[in-house]
Amino acid sequence: MDLHIDNILKDLENDNFQAYLLTQFTNVQYISGYKPTSFAFCVIKENPIIYASGMDMELARKDSTIEVKEYESYDVMIDELKKEGIKNLAIEPSLPFSTYVKFRDDFEIDAKTYIDRQRMIKTPDEIEKITKATEIAQKSFLQLDILNNNGTEKEVAFDLNRLMIENGAFKESFDTIVTSGPASSLPHAIPQDKTLEQPILIDWGAIFEGYCSDNTRTMVYTEHQQEIWDIVAESHDKAIKAIKPGLKCSDIDKVARDIIADYDYEEKFIHSTGHSLGLDIHETPGFSLRDETVIEKGMVITVEPGIYLEGEFGVRLEDTIAISKRADIIGDLPLKIDYF
Protein backbone atom coordinates (compact mmCIF):
# COMPACT_ATOMS: atom_id res chain seq x y z
CA MET A 1 0.00 0.00 0.00
CA ASP A 2 1.13 3.58 -0.65
CA LEU A 3 3.28 4.95 2.18
CA HIS A 4 1.10 8.06 2.56
CA ILE A 5 -2.03 5.93 2.96
CA ASP A 6 -0.29 3.49 5.26
CA ASN A 7 0.83 6.31 7.56
CA ILE A 8 -2.67 7.77 7.69
CA LEU A 9 -4.14 4.35 8.49
CA LYS A 10 -1.76 4.19 11.45
CA ASP A 11 -2.94 7.63 12.57
CA LEU A 12 -6.55 6.49 12.31
CA GLU A 13 -5.83 3.39 14.36
CA ASN A 14 -4.03 5.40 17.04
CA ASP A 15 -7.00 7.76 17.36
CA ASN A 16 -9.65 5.03 17.08
CA PHE A 17 -11.09 6.33 13.82
CA GLN A 18 -12.19 4.06 10.99
CA ALA A 19 -11.92 6.35 7.95
CA TYR A 20 -10.63 9.74 6.81
CA LEU A 21 -12.57 11.95 4.39
CA LEU A 22 -10.75 14.29 1.99
CA THR A 23 -12.21 16.65 -0.61
CA GLN A 24 -9.52 19.30 -1.14
CA PHE A 25 -8.25 18.76 -4.68
CA THR A 26 -4.54 18.71 -3.84
CA ASN A 27 -5.14 16.37 -0.89
CA VAL A 28 -6.88 13.93 -3.22
CA GLN A 29 -4.03 14.35 -5.70
CA TYR A 30 -1.43 13.74 -2.98
CA ILE A 31 -3.06 10.47 -1.98
CA SER A 32 -3.99 9.11 -5.40
CA GLY A 33 -2.21 10.98 -8.20
CA TYR A 34 -5.58 12.13 -9.54
CA LYS A 35 -6.43 15.85 -9.28
CA PRO A 36 -10.18 16.46 -9.53
CA THR A 37 -11.50 19.12 -11.89
CA SER A 38 -15.02 19.19 -10.44
CA PHE A 39 -15.40 17.46 -7.07
CA ALA A 40 -14.37 14.23 -5.40
CA PHE A 41 -14.68 12.44 -2.07
CA CYS A 42 -11.60 10.44 -1.11
CA VAL A 43 -12.20 8.04 1.77
CA ILE A 44 -9.05 6.57 3.28
CA LYS A 45 -9.77 3.25 4.99
CA GLU A 46 -8.50 -0.31 4.73
CA ASN A 47 -9.79 -0.35 1.14
CA PRO A 48 -9.52 3.33 0.12
CA ILE A 49 -11.85 4.69 -2.53
CA ILE A 50 -12.57 7.89 -4.43
CA TYR A 51 -16.12 8.89 -5.35
CA ALA A 52 -15.54 11.04 -8.43
CA SER A 53 -17.75 13.23 -10.57
CA GLY A 54 -19.08 11.56 -13.70
CA MET A 55 -17.34 14.26 -15.74
CA ASP A 56 -14.03 13.17 -14.23
CA MET A 57 -14.30 9.40 -14.46
CA GLU A 58 -12.05 8.96 -17.49
CA LEU A 59 -9.36 11.14 -15.93
CA ALA A 60 -9.74 9.54 -12.50
CA ARG A 61 -9.45 5.99 -13.85
CA LYS A 62 -6.33 6.98 -15.78
CA ASP A 63 -4.51 8.82 -12.98
CA SER A 64 -5.68 7.34 -9.68
CA THR A 65 -3.67 4.68 -7.90
CA ILE A 66 -6.66 3.71 -5.75
CA GLU A 67 -10.16 2.48 -6.57
CA VAL A 68 -12.47 5.00 -8.21
CA LYS A 69 -16.26 4.89 -8.27
CA GLU A 70 -18.66 7.31 -9.90
CA TYR A 71 -20.43 9.50 -7.36
CA GLU A 72 -24.22 9.02 -7.31
CA SER A 73 -25.42 10.86 -4.22
CA TYR A 74 -24.55 11.56 -0.60
CA ASP A 75 -27.11 8.98 0.50
CA VAL A 76 -25.56 6.21 -1.61
CA MET A 77 -22.05 7.06 -0.43
CA ILE A 78 -23.10 7.20 3.23
CA ASP A 79 -25.03 3.92 2.97
CA GLU A 80 -21.99 2.17 1.49
CA LEU A 81 -19.76 3.40 4.30
CA LYS A 82 -22.30 2.35 6.94
CA LYS A 83 -22.58 -1.12 5.38
CA GLU A 84 -18.83 -1.49 5.96
CA GLY A 85 -19.45 -0.87 9.65
CA ILE A 86 -17.96 2.61 9.66
CA LYS A 87 -19.35 4.58 12.59
CA ASN A 88 -16.83 7.39 12.95
CA LEU A 89 -15.09 9.59 10.45
CA ALA A 90 -12.06 11.85 10.62
CA ILE A 91 -12.21 14.82 8.25
CA GLU A 92 -9.66 17.27 6.86
CA PRO A 93 -9.90 20.65 8.65
CA SER A 94 -10.65 22.38 5.33
CA LEU A 95 -13.76 20.27 4.65
CA PRO A 96 -16.59 22.66 3.67
CA PHE A 97 -19.33 23.02 6.27
CA SER A 98 -21.93 22.18 3.64
CA THR A 99 -20.25 18.78 3.22
CA TYR A 100 -19.82 18.26 6.96
CA VAL A 101 -23.56 18.63 7.60
CA LYS A 102 -24.28 15.79 5.14
CA PHE A 103 -22.27 13.36 7.28
CA ARG A 104 -22.75 14.56 10.85
CA ASP A 105 -26.03 12.74 11.52
CA ASP A 106 -24.63 9.35 10.51
CA PHE A 107 -21.09 9.39 11.88
CA GLU A 108 -19.11 10.58 14.86
CA ILE A 109 -16.88 13.23 13.26
CA ASP A 110 -13.71 15.08 14.22
CA ALA A 111 -11.28 17.21 12.22
CA LYS A 112 -7.76 15.76 12.01
CA THR A 113 -4.58 17.15 10.43
CA TYR A 114 -3.16 13.79 9.32
CA ILE A 115 -2.86 14.87 5.69
CA ASP A 116 -1.26 18.21 6.57
CA ARG A 117 1.40 16.47 8.67
CA GLN A 118 2.11 14.05 5.83
CA ARG A 119 2.49 16.84 3.30
CA MET A 120 4.94 18.77 5.50
CA ILE A 121 7.70 16.28 4.74
CA LYS A 122 8.57 16.00 1.05
CA THR A 123 9.88 12.82 -0.53
CA PRO A 124 13.00 12.97 -2.73
CA ASP A 125 10.70 12.73 -5.76
CA GLU A 126 8.66 15.71 -4.58
CA ILE A 127 11.81 17.77 -3.98
CA GLU A 128 13.05 16.85 -7.45
CA LYS A 129 9.82 18.18 -8.99
CA ILE A 130 10.01 21.40 -6.97
CA THR A 131 13.62 21.76 -8.11
CA LYS A 132 12.63 21.29 -11.74
CA ALA A 133 9.84 23.84 -11.38
CA THR A 134 12.37 26.27 -9.90
CA GLU A 135 14.84 25.67 -12.72
CA ILE A 136 12.14 26.40 -15.30
CA ALA A 137 11.04 29.57 -13.52
CA GLN A 138 14.56 30.89 -13.07
CA LYS A 139 15.60 30.11 -16.65
CA SER A 140 12.51 31.94 -17.88
CA PHE A 141 13.26 34.95 -15.68
CA LEU A 142 16.75 35.24 -17.13
CA GLN A 143 15.32 35.15 -20.66
CA LEU A 144 13.19 38.23 -20.04
CA ASP A 145 14.32 41.29 -21.97
CA ILE A 146 12.70 43.78 -19.66
CA LEU A 147 14.39 47.07 -20.42
CA ASN A 148 14.77 46.74 -24.18
CA ASN A 149 11.14 46.12 -25.06
CA ASN A 150 9.57 49.08 -23.21
CA GLY A 151 6.86 46.74 -21.92
CA THR A 152 4.27 47.46 -19.29
CA GLU A 153 4.05 45.55 -16.03
CA LYS A 154 1.21 43.45 -17.46
CA GLU A 155 3.17 42.70 -20.63
CA VAL A 156 6.26 41.62 -18.70
CA ALA A 157 4.13 39.35 -16.49
CA PHE A 158 2.54 37.84 -19.61
CA ASP A 159 5.96 37.30 -21.22
CA LEU A 160 7.28 35.58 -18.10
CA ASN A 161 4.27 33.27 -17.94
CA ARG A 162 4.67 32.44 -21.63
CA LEU A 163 8.38 31.69 -21.23
CA MET A 164 7.70 29.35 -18.30
CA ILE A 165 5.23 27.35 -20.38
CA GLU A 166 7.62 27.27 -23.34
CA ASN A 167 10.34 25.97 -21.01
CA GLY A 168 8.23 23.08 -19.74
CA ALA A 169 5.94 24.40 -17.01
CA PHE A 170 2.27 23.44 -16.85
CA LYS A 171 1.52 27.06 -15.95
CA GLU A 172 2.48 29.71 -13.40
CA SER A 173 2.09 28.60 -9.78
CA PHE A 174 0.22 31.80 -8.80
CA ASP A 175 -0.66 35.13 -10.40
CA THR A 176 2.73 36.52 -11.39
CA ILE A 177 3.57 39.80 -9.66
CA VAL A 178 5.41 42.40 -11.71
CA THR A 179 5.32 45.76 -9.97
CA SER A 180 7.48 48.84 -9.96
CA GLY A 181 7.97 52.28 -8.49
CA PRO A 182 5.76 53.26 -5.53
CA ALA A 183 3.43 50.28 -6.13
CA SER A 184 6.26 47.91 -5.16
CA SER A 185 5.42 48.75 -1.53
CA LEU A 186 2.30 46.58 -1.96
CA PRO A 187 3.30 42.96 -1.18
CA HIS A 188 0.57 41.56 -3.46
CA ALA A 189 0.55 44.25 -6.12
CA ILE A 190 -1.30 43.54 -9.37
CA PRO A 191 0.57 44.26 -12.64
CA GLN A 192 -0.70 47.44 -14.28
CA ASP A 193 -0.82 48.90 -17.80
CA LYS A 194 2.08 51.21 -17.09
CA THR A 195 5.69 51.35 -18.20
CA LEU A 196 8.14 49.98 -15.66
CA GLU A 197 9.56 52.36 -13.07
CA GLN A 198 12.27 51.86 -10.45
CA PRO A 199 12.63 49.64 -8.53
CA ILE A 200 11.20 46.56 -10.23
CA LEU A 201 9.88 43.73 -8.04
CA ILE A 202 9.00 40.38 -9.62
CA ASP A 203 7.46 37.48 -7.66
CA TRP A 204 6.86 34.41 -9.82
CA GLY A 205 6.82 30.63 -9.95
CA ALA A 206 6.14 27.64 -12.18
CA ILE A 207 4.25 24.38 -11.82
CA PHE A 208 5.98 21.19 -12.96
CA GLU A 209 4.14 17.87 -12.63
CA GLY A 210 1.86 19.45 -10.05
CA TYR A 211 4.57 20.99 -7.87
CA CYS A 212 5.13 24.72 -7.37
CA SER A 213 8.13 27.00 -7.23
CA ASP A 214 8.37 30.52 -5.79
CA ASN A 215 11.02 33.25 -6.09
CA THR A 216 11.15 37.01 -5.73
CA ARG A 217 13.79 39.43 -6.94
CA THR A 218 13.90 43.22 -6.63
CA MET A 219 16.02 45.27 -9.03
CA VAL A 220 16.97 48.61 -7.47
CA TYR A 221 18.20 51.89 -8.95
CA THR A 222 18.81 54.63 -6.37
CA GLU A 223 21.21 54.70 -3.44
CA HIS A 224 18.33 54.60 -0.94
CA GLN A 225 16.79 51.60 -2.69
CA GLN A 226 20.17 49.87 -2.56
CA GLU A 227 20.44 50.55 1.19
CA ILE A 228 17.08 48.87 1.78
CA TRP A 229 18.01 46.02 -0.58
CA ASP A 230 21.18 45.39 1.45
CA ILE A 231 19.18 45.14 4.70
CA VAL A 232 16.69 42.71 3.18
CA ALA A 233 19.53 40.64 1.68
CA GLU A 234 21.20 40.42 5.09
CA SER A 235 17.93 39.28 6.66
CA HIS A 236 17.43 36.71 3.86
CA ASP A 237 20.96 35.31 4.12
CA LYS A 238 21.14 35.12 7.91
CA ALA A 239 17.70 33.51 8.18
CA ILE A 240 18.74 30.79 5.72
CA LYS A 241 22.03 30.25 7.54
CA ALA A 242 20.12 29.78 10.83
CA ILE A 243 17.80 27.05 9.53
CA LYS A 244 18.43 23.57 10.90
CA PRO A 245 16.34 20.63 12.09
CA GLY A 246 15.26 20.87 15.71
CA LEU A 247 14.66 24.61 15.78
CA LYS A 248 11.14 26.01 15.70
CA CYS A 249 9.80 27.82 12.65
CA SER A 250 9.27 30.88 14.84
CA ASP A 251 13.01 30.93 15.60
CA ILE A 252 13.79 31.57 11.94
CA ASP A 253 11.19 34.30 11.65
CA LYS A 254 12.79 35.99 14.65
CA VAL A 255 16.25 35.87 13.05
CA ALA A 256 14.97 37.54 9.88
CA ARG A 257 12.87 40.07 11.79
CA ASP A 258 15.62 40.99 14.25
CA ILE A 259 18.00 41.92 11.42
CA ILE A 260 15.45 44.31 9.97
CA ALA A 261 14.68 45.67 13.45
CA ASP A 262 18.39 46.44 13.93
CA TYR A 263 17.98 49.05 11.18
CA ASP A 264 14.71 50.39 12.67
CA TYR A 265 12.49 49.03 9.90
CA GLU A 266 10.66 46.40 11.96
CA GLU A 267 7.30 48.10 11.35
CA LYS A 268 7.89 47.89 7.61
CA PHE A 269 8.24 44.09 7.53
CA ILE A 270 4.53 43.32 7.37
CA HIS A 271 4.27 39.59 6.63
CA SER A 272 5.78 36.32 7.78
CA THR A 273 9.26 35.26 6.70
CA GLY A 274 8.20 32.26 4.63
CA HIS A 275 5.79 29.45 3.81
CA SER A 276 5.99 25.82 2.77
CA LEU A 277 5.06 24.88 -0.77
CA GLY A 278 4.42 21.72 -2.77
CA LEU A 279 1.23 20.83 -4.61
CA ASP A 280 -0.11 24.12 -3.22
CA ILE A 281 1.80 27.37 -3.32
CA HIS A 282 1.05 27.94 0.38
CA GLU A 283 1.31 24.98 2.72
CA THR A 284 2.21 24.46 6.37
CA PRO A 285 4.39 25.06 8.26
CA GLY A 286 5.67 28.59 7.76
CA PHE A 287 8.34 30.81 9.20
CA SER A 288 6.20 33.08 11.37
CA LEU A 289 6.32 34.24 14.97
CA ARG A 290 3.21 32.19 15.76
CA ASP A 291 4.32 28.90 14.17
CA GLU A 292 5.89 26.64 16.80
CA THR A 293 6.34 23.69 14.41
CA VAL A 294 9.70 21.99 14.84
CA ILE A 295 11.79 22.07 11.67
CA GLU A 296 12.43 18.61 10.20
CA LYS A 297 14.46 17.16 7.37
CA GLY A 298 12.42 17.02 4.18
CA MET A 299 10.55 20.27 4.72
CA VAL A 300 10.58 22.77 1.85
CA ILE A 301 9.98 26.36 2.96
CA THR A 302 10.53 29.78 1.41
CA VAL A 303 12.49 32.61 2.99
CA GLU A 304 11.18 35.99 1.82
CA PRO A 305 11.82 38.99 4.07
CA GLY A 306 10.76 42.39 2.81
CA ILE A 307 10.68 46.07 3.68
CA TYR A 308 7.78 48.16 2.36
CA LEU A 309 7.95 51.96 2.47
CA GLU A 310 4.45 53.21 1.74
CA GLY A 311 4.30 55.68 -1.11
CA GLU A 312 7.98 55.13 -1.96
CA PHE A 313 8.92 51.54 -2.86
CA GLY A 314 9.32 48.03 -1.51
CA VAL A 315 12.03 45.36 -1.58
CA ARG A 316 11.47 41.62 -1.17
CA LEU A 317 13.94 38.78 -1.82
CA GLU A 318 12.76 35.17 -1.86
CA ASP A 319 14.27 31.74 -2.29
CA THR A 320 12.91 28.26 -1.63
CA ILE A 321 14.82 26.13 0.85
CA ALA A 322 15.06 22.33 1.05
CA ILE A 323 15.96 21.26 4.57
CA SER A 324 18.35 18.36 5.13
CA LYS A 325 21.09 18.53 7.75
CA ARG A 326 21.30 22.14 6.66
CA ALA A 327 19.34 24.59 4.53
CA ASP A 328 19.91 24.17 0.81
CA ILE A 329 18.70 26.88 -1.57
CA ILE A 330 16.81 25.37 -4.50
CA GLY A 331 18.02 26.88 -7.76
CA ASP A 332 21.03 29.03 -8.56
CA LEU A 333 19.59 32.41 -9.52
CA PRO A 334 21.75 35.23 -8.09
CA LEU A 335 20.10 37.34 -5.42
CA LYS A 336 21.42 40.51 -7.01
CA ILE A 337 20.03 41.25 -10.47
CA ASP A 338 21.27 44.41 -12.17
CA TYR A 339 18.96 45.82 -14.84
CA PHE A 340 19.86 49.48 -14.42
Predicted regions and their residues:
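Active-site neighborhoods and metal-handling regions in enzymes and metal-associated proteins
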Residues: M1-F340
